[in-house]
Amino acid sequence: MKKIIIGIDISKEKIDASAIDVRNSQLGVLKLDYQVFENRPMGFRRMLVWAKHLIKGVTLEEVMFCCETTGGYDRCLCDYLFAKGLDIWRESSLQIKKSCGLRKGKDDKADSLTIAEYAMRHMDKAVYYVSPSETVRELKALLLYRRKLEQEKTSKKVRVAELKATAAKSKSVSFILRDAQKSIRALEKSIKECEKQILAL
């Protein structure tokens, strides 16, 4: 049973953290503190120093961190806390919104408290983050890169088709078409190389 919950609202540049004491939750949530930290390793270290000051009589192992999935902005923090042996629950922002109702406007302080209170109410459903292996990370990076290459190739092919269909013949159009075809071939080569890297994992 966790004794302290720290709800974290994460953006690209910063993390807003609200801590609550849930040992006597039947008497109401005891709000401990709220702080803002940079979303980078120095900010993570400062957050843990802050947390240690708050939780006298409680170890960090008895603290649960909870954040919304944010499309990547939360990953570094989750990896950092996981490496420290601490528990962080990454929950779907949609799930939190469903449970807590609509929030009017964007208030990072209020959002971090909402996340903490959500984690308290649904503590029995918590699924703690496990950092993926290096192979999984590499695979995700390569698949993402391959998708971007494919999108770029498709875009260039569409542009070539449009030029052929609409543009009058001229030296400049001929150059653009030749150069675009050259770029498409280069992209196809990169896609094949990327696929080799994927198969080699």
State what each model feature region is.
Residues 74-84:
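Short Gly/Thr/Asp-enriched flexible loops that form oxyanion-binding sites at enzyme active sites
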Residues 12-42:
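Short glycine-rich, Thr/Ser-proximal phosphate-binding strand/loop in the N-terminal lobe
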Residues 63-76:
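Acidic, metal-coordinating catalytic cores used for nucleic-acid/nucleotide bond scission
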Residues 41-64:
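Short, basic/hydrophobic alpha-helical segments
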